[in-house]
Structures are given as structure tokens and as C-alpha cells.
Amino acid sequence: MRNTRKLEEITFDEMLELASLGAQVLNNRSVELAKKYNVELEVLSSLNPIPGTVVKEVTKMEGMLIKGVAKDTDVAVITILNVPDEPGTSFKIFGLLAQKNINVDIILQSTGRDGKKDISFTCSEGEADTALRVLKDSGKFQDVTCDETCAKVSIVGAGMQSHSGVASKMFEALSNNNINIKMISTSEIKISCIIDRNDADKAVSAIHDMLFD
């Protein structure tokens, strides 16, 4: 990737998001403990003696909109078709998954039609078979599909809370590279898109070039 650079500082929350989104830098638990007890961390290189990136509660770089781009290729999208468009349907679905400790990430619900709707969600590829089996064995959901050719690309940065247009630039980068977005999830400091797995590396480079060049 072109024009990468080291961050001087990053917040605990930003580092936690990046770690959970596939950035292989720090273990989630280590950052959670550091945040809990407000202990600063420094990410160093074993090959280079220069100062590293400090992970702390508040940084001096809050004006920097985006702190990182991450990808996760361990993603499956499961879609349940033609479920009743009525109260309690989502509880029945995700209650079954929770009983099997299946971690659900992004959820997308279609607009209801003729009393029916479709619900899609993402989970790890390793949990996809279990999720399919649980849903079908319940006898309530038989029309279930699974797409195991997906990836998630995300941008993280606390600066997004006070600046508009970041999502637009991310989507523009993907559009310019003919990358289709299947699902979108946002929070105060994160935007994630589900795309085709074969496009993951290209997407990360395109987003980085759009937001950091």
C-alpha cells in the first residue's frame, strides 16, 4: 500500500475498534484492560528502535479524521427469507443464535411486503454452519441462504463524529473501483461495508488512497 505512515497517538476506543475489525496490532483484551485502568500502551517494532504509537484515553490528534482502515475476510452473510413482518420475529431469530453463543455483527432488515420481510446478518465463517443448522432445526425458518464469499472493510476515527462527508468519500472510493457494497454499518467512530471477498485488498487500498492522500 502506498503512503502509509505511523500514528503518533490513538485512543483506546479507536484501537479497540481496529482490533475487533481485523487489524492485527493488539489483542482486544489487552486494550480493554488498559482502558479500564487508564494505563497508556505503546506499540513498538521489534526491528526498529524508533518511538511507536501511544494508545491512550485522549489524543492530540483528534483533528485527524481517520486513524485506520481494516479488513476482515472471516465473514459470512446469512439471509432468512420471507419471515413474518410482525413483532417478535427478530427476537426469535437472534434468541436462537444467542443460545448457541453465535456472535452476530451487522444486521440488515428489508422493507416488509405482503406481511413478509427478509433479515440478513453477518457472523464469522466458522460459525455459519452452526447458525444455519440452528435456524433450520427450529422448524420456524426454512428458507435460509449463506454467502461465504464476503469480507468487511472498515474505517475508524473519532474525528468522524464532528465532520460530514467521510462516508461519502469511502463509498466514492469503492464506486470508483467498481466494488459493490452489500451491507453497511455505522457508529460514532466506525463505518463498515460488506463487500465481495475478492475485492477486499483493492478496497482497502482505494479507501486509503482516497482518505489519506
What are the functions of these language-model segments?
Residues 1-213:
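C-terminal catalytic "cap/lid" subdomain
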